[in-house]
């Protein structure tokens, strides 16, 4: 998600 926060794209 967005720049890849929390290890999720």
UniProtKB/Swiss-Prot annotation:
**Is Disulfide bond one of the keywords?**
no
What EC numbers are recorded for this enzyme?
Answer: 2.4.1.5
Q: Which domain of life is it from?
A: Bacteria
Any coiled-coil regions, as ranges: none
**A GO term from the CC aspect:** cytoplasm
Compartmental location = Cytoplasm
Which UniProt keyword terms apply here? Cytoplasm, Glycosyltransferase, Transferase
Enzyme class (EC, first level): transferase
Thermal dependence of activity, per record: Optimum temperature is 35 degrees Celsius.
Functional note: Involved in the production of dextran, an extracellular glucan polymer.
Q: Which family does it belong to?
A: Belongs to the glycosyl hydrolase 70 family.
Q: What is this protein called?
A: Dextransucrase
Organism lineage: Bacteria, Bacillati, Bacillota, Bacilli, Lactobacillales
